[in-house]
């Protein structure tokens, strides 16, 4: 086992609406390296447990990443499977004034999202080289998901609703899909 992690309770600060739990999977189970690399939802960073030796010498793809948690997960995936515990044992705070998400929404949000997607794409490709291409197809699929989610975040719904993105669209929760459909079919009512 290269990584253990668990679910989290979500504590919302401010006016954000979200799920009350952060549960990447339903039920405790083994997670394959491919699932770690190309996951449909995030892992609570505070829950990540791994061997210290994994971070003794960090590769370039880690050092140049805009965030640290996903590259850590990729390092773990390169070492093997993970164990997920479907038990909330930490709190994931959402909407704090100094949080990464809040800071991303200040200023030119679209440019920040595009820059983030470009940096993460470079990071994934760096991991692909680091792992000797063992997970190449999985990495490329993860990049497609990342680009899709960037389009969701920046409200490029024509791309989001494109037939080629149907797989990723179906992974969105029902609330998000409802609001995308509402905003695209009744934009004046949505803006009201």
Where are these regions (language model features)?
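Phosphate/oxyanion-binding loops and surfaces in catalytic or ligand/nucleic-acid-binding neighborhoods
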Residues: 11, 79-83, 130
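Conserved nucleotide-sugar donor-binding catalytic segment
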Residues: 6, 24-108
């Amino acid at each position: 086992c290269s990584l253990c992690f668990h679910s989290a309770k979500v504590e919302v600060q401010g006016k954000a609406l979200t799920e009350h739990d952060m549960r990447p999977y339903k039920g405790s189970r083994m997670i394959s390296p491919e699932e770690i690399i190309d996951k449909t939802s995030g892992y609570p960073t505070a829950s990540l447990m791994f061997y210290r030796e994994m971070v003794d010498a960090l590769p370039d793809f880690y050092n140049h990443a805009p965030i640290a948690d996903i590259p850590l997960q990729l390092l773990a995936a390169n070492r093997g499977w993970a164990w997920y515990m479907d038990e909330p044992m930490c709190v994931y705070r959402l909407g704090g004034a100094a949080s990464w998400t809040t800071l991303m929404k200040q200023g030119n949000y679209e440019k920040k999202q595009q820059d983030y997607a470009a940096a993460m794409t470079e990071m994934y490709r760096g991991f692909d080289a680091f792992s000797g291409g063992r997970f190449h197809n999985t990495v490329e699929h993860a990049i497609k998901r990342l680009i899709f989610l960037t389009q969701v975040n920046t409200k490029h719904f024509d791309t989001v609703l494109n037939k080629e993105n149907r797989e990723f669209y179906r992974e969105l929760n029902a609330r998000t899909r409802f609001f995308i459909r509402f905003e695209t079919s009744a934009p004046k009512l949505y803006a009201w």
